Amino acid sequence: MLDVMARPGNLMGECPQMTTEVVPEPGLPAQAQAVAQPQEVAAPLTSAAIFLVMVIQPGADSCAAVRDLFSDLAGLLRAVGFRDPDAKLSCVVGIGSQAWDRLAGPARPAGLHVFPEIEAGSRHAVSTPGDILLHIRAARFDLCFELATHIMTRLSRAVSPVDEVHGFRYFDDRDLIGFVDGTENPTGRRAVEATIIGPEDPEFAGGSYVIVQKYLHDVSGWNALPTEEQERIVGRTKLSDIELDDAVKPTSAHNALTTITENGEEVQIVRDNMPFGTVSRGDFGTYFIGYARSPRPIEQMLTNMFVGRPPGNYDRLLDFSTAMTGTLFFVPSMPLLESLAEPAEEDPAAGEAGADSPGAGQAAPVATPSDGSLGIGSLRGVTQHE
């Protein structure tokens, strides 16, 4: 039995809404010609990262503090990053569905909604609160930590932290269950095309979507499995990181269920997953973070994993991994993010029908086909780019 629902991120205080204007700039990918520079969602993997998820406190002052951070973020990055430019310090900002209503007004990105909860048997992809995501990364952890400290000092009275994870590179980009992570990531222009919104949503072209989940692993149980069984669950060899041949790879393998096709071609996303852990507590985890130009492919990958394709043929990794969080964010282009710093005059009508109205920020119900599945199986002919 599949139960799919959405939960609100947090209660909203009233904030002045604003209007936005996207300014064109040259030199961007074909699908993003209408906007200026995207945030660094397609940047290469780094050796250190901090993931901060927070909710905005009620009230206009809290919104104002968050907007001020948006306008000053580039300066903060320069102030911290100058110590080692080669470390490539960056910070991607994502905005949750309900926070968008508070910060940006009625115009919404087409794919922005509350992350849909997925439950099937004992497997549960939870939906958890989150108004703002900060994905801070660099080749040096000290730079990440310094930037996070400056940001949280600025926002101390305006936000409440929901989750903070410190990620690190583990050997040759392996996760804590011993397999290389991110092998199939696109690079260069292919990464940009996979992550940056184009003409399908022209008002928000240059933006992106990101889904984050914090997984904890039963490492003892996993390590008790023979290596060959682990490889069949993942779909790749453990030592050499070679994909198993289709003749021997189960249809429930992780990399089989997370392969999504559209019109005969694989739909790609960019994963920037990082291991994390606390040895004394026995916490060993993977922070999943996936960027895409539409949230639909990632949501369907997760449905394949938790429900199965077909239903019941689920990802056996979930017998050893538990999702502790799950949140969807929109990642504005750089000029759109900076423009959010200046609220427009509040529209009384918008305030009456805004975030505090019944159903605001809720995801639409997921239509279930008559066979009981979510229609995920083969996605050929299904448009992923909204």
Protein language model regions, located:
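Short, positively charged and aromatic/hydrophobic N-terminal segments
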Residues: D3-E14
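Long, histidine/aromatic-enriched segments associated with O2/redox biology
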Residues: C15-I376, G381-H385
